[in-house]
Amino acid sequence: MVMTDPIADFLTRIRNANQANHEVLEVPASNIKKGIAEILKREGFVKNVEFIEDDKQGIIRVFLKYGQNGEKVITGLKRVSKPGLRVYKKREDLPKVLNGLGIAILSTSEGLLTDKEARQKNVGGEVIAYVW
């Protein structure tokens, strides 16, 4: 079966593994998924990210993060810009997720950035997802 939206699939796999309290998640690799995983690690939503080379496209191993009492660090993931309806925002209109408690992941001319980084670099772009 052909996957029409690999980013939505990646976010759904993270959401499902998080809801099931899994420690580790493995997904087929792509450059944009690597970028999203690195942003999630940098922003503290996941513990660690590993990239495993194989005969094909590679695998991304994501280590999910939980609090001391088992509470979930990622409470929500939402795909914003979809293949059928792209969502672009100018630098003045960049969204704030939960008044700054969450992040928006954007694809910009500077690469994949969070909403805060895009404001600092003064660039807009395609809103990929919200994470909170």
From Swiss-Prot:
GO terms for biological process: translation. GO terms for molecular function: rRNA binding; structural constituent of ribosome. GO terms for cellular component: ribonucleoprotein complex; ribosome. It holds the Pfam family Ribosomal_S8. Belongs to the universal ribosomal protein uS8 family. Part of the 30S ribosomal subunit. Contacts proteins S5 and S12. This is Small ribosomal subunit protein uS8. It comes from Streptococcus gordonii (strain Challis / ATCC 35105 / BCRC 15272 / CH1 / DL1 / V288). The gene is rpsH.
